[in-house]
A protein has these predicted regions:
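Aromatic-lined substrate-binding rim segments of carbohydrate-active enzymes
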Residues: 64-130, 202, 206-207
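Aromatic, loop-rich ligand-recognition surfaces of beta-strand-rich domains
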Residues: 566, 627-637, 643-776
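N-terminal carbohydrate-binding accessory modules
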Residues: 23-78, 108
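Aromatic- and acidic-residue-enriched segments that line the glycan-binding/catalytic groove
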Residues: 92-99, 112, 123-148, 198-202, ...
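Catalytic-core region of carbohydrate-active enzymes that cleave or remodel glycosidic bonds
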Residues: 208, 241-335, 339, 350
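Aromatic-lined ligand-binding clefts that engage carbohydrates, nucleic acids, or primary amines
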Residues: 422-437, 539-562, 569-570, 592-595
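Short beta-strand-plus-loop segments that form exposed binding edges in beta-rich domains
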Residues: 468-474, 594-600, 667-674
């Protein structure tokens, strides 16, 4: 009987193991993942992908396992990741897949925790990451055309893809790993139409060894067919609040038997310096996921956990230029520090009801311990101008890349001729934030976000030293503006009533972001300077834990702790703290170095247990309407007046004849469903040949109504190249709302293109009137 009991116990144990593992990947076991009629198939059985997007680059390697466990406890069965080219190949031909960059180790950890992997190797990844994941050194080739069949770009892409294949191809499920799908490029329809290029990237992915699992391409519902290849799976990206049926309508018409997947379901949104902290409603997010699960639609939650964009790796959007904060909290279910939020528990409750057969959702892992650090003074300082590196000489102005510098700050120095008072110094262009000095005296600051590029000079004697210190704040990560060279990109001129004079004969000093560089300075006692300087001190800890460094009294710059680049700070907010993982601290002495380009109010740092992500000190108003301001259209003759079609996708309105002017006004008469708020995703004006006009210099000069209650739904979103961000009027404001666009110069237009917003929460415009004139 005892022998029988042992056998029964063994059988029960085996059954429990099988039950717990369900359809999870176990190391060494080979599986088949394929496409069936209307569904994905895992070993021949229908499988709904419930993926959590997290990024190994935004999580300390020591915390990878915890974050993966958090995703599993959320109810997910898959982890979705990008591969970041520029983190792995920071110098041409030098690949780094070790330590924090060990992407294969990350995937194996996911497999150990019973999670599949969706791999997105780019080469372009967007992700609010520096240059969309492309390496800066590509821009050293002056005529390069990124994300095209440019021979050099394709050559370097194939080399990188082969290295990714060496790391990950053997981790496909057919070979005992956990990779079930691999993506080709990323949202390319928002960039261009070029199927030949997409085919080349597909071939590069295959040549790298990814031949066993389905390859897919993601795009927006309005653009997915522009570059869709017949042999790739098509997936759609959209976010919280989307109308699920409308998003998939065109895909179902094009491929009625294909499995459906939202490859990026945006749980929140990212933060920009100088703009309000972004949040999205948890209930609306969960409702959207439920709608998909009820229809057996697979999804990947972007982001399940955003983490932190450590160091200098944050990207930017354009137009208008706007750099990303270091926090990538994203208002995701798992917070920046790895905590389970109310949004997490709400989603977990739903996913528990849709668990896979045999799936047991584990308990939520405990968060890492928190500590506080009492305020301490950063008591050593090294003025930047007293710690200049060796210069490079250049006859003419060149961007940072031509001096073999990828990131950081760059100083351009020359001597001036005699300058009359009132002369204008024109810097074309400032990328991204500059300070101008004459013999060490600050004359002005220029911010690319505001389009600033001139300083009016006082009278200056011949031989006066001119210094232009330029900080690179992050390369644009979206659309054609990714060709974003840093420093001063063209030239510097003096403009006066006697003419224009281009300045030449520059001494150029590079200030990179490497820890070895910032450590090797002549530090001396002192705790406050007016102007750019490095600050250093040490602080003692009796215990270690996660903490948020409070940078509220500092100006603008970067922080390093124990050699780790923590990220950027800027007094304008909304982010005022930097997440400091406890795994990078140590008991006893810890070192902190701070580069502050403005100078601190107080050279003091303390560690808090809670982040500050929503303290905005920006000078710019949140909306585009001054107190009491109104728009008078009486007597104006419209250039267009009519109704827009309902439904998803771009619509085009042609005028009876071309018109010339600078200011364009769009007035929304009503909404498709008769409710009181209007919305628009994207808007283009068409030139006399019917082609879209460039929008990088556009500005909203007036907006009658803008919603900022639970997001930045301001009017400038109609030309930010993002279908997922949009202008929405404030709930309850009366019709008709109006938006006035300033093109900055007179243009001839023949019509406009308009992308309606397809959300379940907001309404598209129905009737519109358009006005066009040369003066405000």
């Amino acid at each position: 009987m005892k022998h029988v009991n042992k056998i029964l116990a063994g059988l029960i144990t085996c059954c429990v193991i099988l039950l717990l593992s369900g359809c999870s990947p176990r190391q060494g076991e080979k599986h088949d993942f394929s496409i069936g009629k209307g569904t994905f198939l895992l070993d021949g059985k229908p499988f709904v992908i419930k993926a959590a997007e997290i990024h190994y680059t935004r999580i300390p390697a020591e915390y990878w396992q915890h974050r993966i466990q958090m995703c599993k406890a959320l109810g997910m069965n898959t982890i979705c990741i990008y591969a970041f080219w520029n983190i792995h190949e920071q110098k041409p031909g030098e690949f780094d897949f070790k330590g924090q960059n060990d992407i294969a180790a990350f995937c194996r950890l996911a497999q150990k925790e019973g999670m599949y992997i969706m791999l997105r190797p780019g080469p372009y990844v967007c992700s609010e990451w520096e240059m969309g994941g492309l390496p800066w050194w590509l821009l050293k080739k002056e005529d390069i055309k990124l994300r095209t069949n440019d021979p050099y770009f394709l050559e370097r892409t194939k080399l990188f893809m082969n290295e990714i294949g060496k790391q990950l191809a053997d981790l496909q499920v057919t070979r005992g790993g956990n990779i079930i799908m691999v993506q080709v490029e990323n949202e390319y329809g928002a960039y261009a139409t070029d199927k030949a290029y997409i085919a080349n990237i597909r071939d590069a992915v295959k040549a790298a060894g990814f031949t066993d699992v389905p390859l897919f391409q993601c795009d927006w519902s309005s653009t997915f067919q522009l570059n869709g290849l017949d042999d790739l799976v098509w997936t759609i990206n959209f976010g919280t609040g989307a109308n699920i049926d409308a998003q998939f309508k065109k895909l179902k018409e094009a491929r009625p038997d294909a499995p459906l997947m939202c490859s990026e379901f945006w749980s929140g949104w990212f933060d920009h310096w100088g703009r309000k902290h972004e949040t999205r409603d948890a209930g609306v997010m969960v409702s959207g996921i439920k709608d998909m699960l009820d229809r057996h639609i697979s999804f990947s939650l972007y982001m399940a956990h955003g983490g932190t964009t450590f160091g200098h790796w944050g990207g930017a959007n354009s137009p208008a230029y706007s750099a990303m904060c270091s926090s990538y909290d994203y208002d995701a279910p798992i917070s920046e520090a790895g905590w389970a939020t109310p949004k997490y528990y709400k989603l977990r409750e739903l996913l528990t009801q849709y668990a896979d057969s045999g799936q047991v959702i584990p308990d939520v892992p405990a968060a890492y311990p928190l500590i506080e650090i009492p305020a301490f003074t950063v008591g050593e300082v090294a003025p930047l101008f007293d710690n200049l590196p060796a210069p490079q000489a250049s006859k003419e102005i060149k961007p940072m890349e031509q001096f073999d510098q990828g990131w950081g700050t760059i100083l351009y120095r020359t001597t001036l001729p005699a300058v009359k008072e009132g002369t204008t110094l024109l810097i074309d262009e400032v990328h991204d934030w500059a300070q101008v000095f004459a013999d060490g005296k600050l004359l002005g600051r220029l911010d690319r976000r505001r389009g600033e590029n001139t300083v009016v000079l006082p009278a200056l004697a011949a031989g006066t030293r001119l210094d232009i210190l330029v900080e690179a704040m992050g390369r644009v990560n979206f659309d054609v503006a990714i060709h974003d060279r840093k420093g001063i990109t063209d030239k510097v001129e003096l403009i006066s009533d006697t003419g224009r004079q281009e300045l030449e004969d520059w001494q150029v000093y590079s200030f990179p972001v490497d820890y070895a560089f910032v450590q090797d300075k002549k530090y001396a006692a002192g705790d406050k300077l007016d102007g750019p300087a490095y600050y250093r001190t040490t602080f003692e800890l009796d215990e270690v834990g996660d903490v948020f460094l409070d940078m509220q009294t500092w100006g603008k710059g970067m922080v390093w702790v124990n050699g780790k680049a923590m990220g950027r700070f800027w007094e304008i907010g909304p982010q005022q703290t930097l997440f400091m993982p406890g795994c990078w601290l140590k008991k006893g002495k810890n070192e902190i170095i701070i580069l502050d380009l403005l100078g601190p109010e107080k050279a003091v740092v303390e560690g808090r247990k809670e982040p500050i992500l929503d303290m905005l000190r920006a000078e710019a108003p949140a909306t585009h309407r001054e107190e009491g301001q109104t728009l008078n259209l009486k007597g104006e003759k419209p250039v267009a007046n009519g109704a827009l079609k309902p439904g998803n996708g771009w619509q085009e309105v042609k005028f009876g004849q071309t018109v010339k002017g600078r200011y364009f006004c769009l007035e929304a008469l009503d909404a498709q469903d008769g409710k009181d708020n209007a919305a628009m995703a994207e808007f283009y004006l068409l030139d006399e040949d019917g082609k879209p006009l460039p929008r990088q210099h556009w500005n909203i000069s007036y907006a009658d109504s803008e919603s900022t209650q639970w997001g930045n739904f301001t009017a400038d979103k109609i030309y930010d190249l993002q279908e997922s961000t949009y202008w929405s009027t404030k709930q309850g404001d009366k019709y008709p709302p109006q938006v006035v666009i300033d093109l900055k110069e007179e243009q001839t237009i023949s019509g406009f293109r308009y992308l309606p917003l397809v959300l379940s929460l907001h309404n598209m415009n129905s009737g519109v009137i358009a006005y066009w004139r040369s003066s405000p």
